[in-house]
């Protein structure tokens, strides 16, 4: 199972609009579950059949761990580079908000969790989560082919 966990870019966009940007990428790469926070109430929309909302990222990560998924933090400060990464079969990829360093979550990470980075020419951390998710999911697809 493939799961993606991230936060709404509150103040930049509306969750309803942002969910469409995420959904297009995630469905194309057969992601099973999209987990977003904080709760916005858009789950009731008929096209959001695989969207789950949580109060915060820790709650979503705890649920993924309880389901037996490997936690993969994707961040510009990640320890492992995407090129050398072997994707777990059951994975929950955690993306922060734009320019949000996930280092605090790494500090709370369980042994076995991975911190992954996608190198870009400027490595500023500015691409949106759904943009980096497309790169990570494409890498997963190509390595599985």
Regions found by a protein language model. Name each.
Residues 1-145:
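Post-transcriptional modification and biogenesis factors for structured RNAs
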